[in-house]
C-alpha cells in the first residue's frame, strides 16, 4: 500500500485545444562538416555548431506563443521537428543535433529554404519566418532564388552567419588534427558573408553575424514585425491525484492493525487497554 501511495497514481488526464496569437518560425540549421570549425579566428574556440545551438535556444525562449519547427541540412535537407508549440521538445531536439546527422556533405541552402516553406501551416494570415543559420560555404543550389520564392509567399528569411572571413580549420578528432586536402594542406573554412546577406535581402529578412552579442535581439526584433494570428495550441490539464484514497485506506488499516495486535499481545494485555476492571467489594 505504501508503494502505491509513493507512486502517486493519477487518472483523468485531459487535453484541450486553445487559441493563442503568434507567428510560425522554421529554423534551418547547417550541419555540414565545416560547422565543426571554430566560430572565431581561434582554432580552439567554440565550434560554429555549438554556438549556433546556444543562439537558437535563446531565440526559442523568446518566441512566447509562437510555433517553431526545425530542419537540418548539409548536402540534403531533413525535417528534424515539424512545426509545434512544444518548445521543450524543440530544445531537446536542438541539443541532440550533430554534424553526423546528414550523410551527404555539402551546403544545400536552397533545399533547406524550400523545405521550410513547405513546412508551414495553411493559415495564410499568420506571419511566417525562416531562420537560416549557416557558414554559407560550398553552397550547391540557388539559395537566393529560393529566398525570393519565399518572399513571394510573404515568408521572411533571416540569416545568421557563422564563422569569420579569416576562417578556421576543421577539427577531425584529436588535439591539433585538422581536415586536409588531397595535397596534404589544412583546409580553411570561411564564412561566405556576401551570400548570406543576399539571401536575407531577397526575402525581407535581416543578416546578423553569429559572433555578435546582438544576434538574438536583432532577429527577435525583425520577427516582431510579422503579423500575429490565432494559432491552435494543445494544453494538457493536470491529472487528478488518486493517492489520497489509498492513503486513507492505509491509515484505517494501520489503526485496525494496532488494535488487533494490542489485544493479542500478551505483554500489552496485562495493561488492560481493552478490558474494563471490575472492583471486587469482598476484598
Residues covered by each model-derived region:
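DG-centered beta-turn motif at the end of beta-strands
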Residues: 2, 30-32, 52, 70-73, ...
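VWA/integrin I-like adhesion module and closely mimicked acidic/polar interface patches used
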Residues: 103-107, 129, 136-202
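Juxtamembrane amphipathic/hinge helix adjacent to a transmembrane helix
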Residues: 206, 210-243
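Extracytoplasmic/secreted proteins, especially bacterial periplasmic and envelope-associated proteins
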Residues: 51-58, 89-92, 108-111, 115, ...
Amino acid at each position: 500500500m505504501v508503494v502505491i501511495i509513493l507512486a502517486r497514481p493519477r487518472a483523468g488526464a485531459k487535453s484541450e485545444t486553445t487559441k493563442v496569437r503568434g507567428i510560425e518560425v522554421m529554423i534551418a540549421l547547417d550541419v555540414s562538416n565545416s560547422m565543426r570549425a571554430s566560430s572565431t579566428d581561434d582554432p580552439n574556440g567554440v565550434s560554429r555548431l555549438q554556438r549556433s545551438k546556444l543562439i537558437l535556444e535563446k531565440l526559442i525562449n523568446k518566441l512566447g506563443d509562437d510555433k517553431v519547427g526545425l530542419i537540418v541540412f548539409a548536402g540534403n535537407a531533413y525535417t528534424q521537428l515539424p512545426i509545434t508549440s512544444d518548445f521543450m521538445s524543440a530544445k531537446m531536439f536542438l541539443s541532440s543535433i550533430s554534424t553526423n546527422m546528414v550523410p551527404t556533405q555539402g551546403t544545400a541552402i536552397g533545399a533547406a529554404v524550400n523545405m521550410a516553406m513547405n513546412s508551414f501551416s495553411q493559415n495564410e494570415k499568420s506571419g511566417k519566418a525562416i531562420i537560416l543559420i549557416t557558414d554559407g560555404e560550398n553552397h550547391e543550389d540557388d539559395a537566393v532564388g529560393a529566398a525570393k520564392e519565399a518572399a513571394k509567399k510573404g515568408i521572411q528569411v533571416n540569416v545568421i552567419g557563422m564563422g569569420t572571413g579569416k576562417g578556421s580549420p576543421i577539427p577531425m578528432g584529436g588535439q591539433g588534427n585538422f581536415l586536409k586536402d588531397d595535397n596534404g594542406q589544412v583546409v580553411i573554412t570561411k564564412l561566405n558573408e556576401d551570400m548570406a546577406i543576399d539571401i536575407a535581402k531577397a526575402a525581407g529578412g535581416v543578416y546578423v553575424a553569429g559572433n555578435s552579442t546582438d544576434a538574438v535581439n536583432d532577429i527577435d526584433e525583425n520577427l516582431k514585425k510579422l503579423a500575429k494570428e490565432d494559432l491552435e495550441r494543445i494544453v494538457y490539464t493536470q491529472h487528478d491525484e488518486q493517492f489520497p484514497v489509498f492513503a486513507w485506506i492505509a491509515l484505517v488499516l494501520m489503526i485496525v492493525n494496532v488494535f488487533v495486535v494490542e489485544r493479542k499481545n500478551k505483554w500489552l494485555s496485562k495493561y488492560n487497554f481493552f478490558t474494563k476492571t471490575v472492583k471486587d467489594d469482598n476484598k
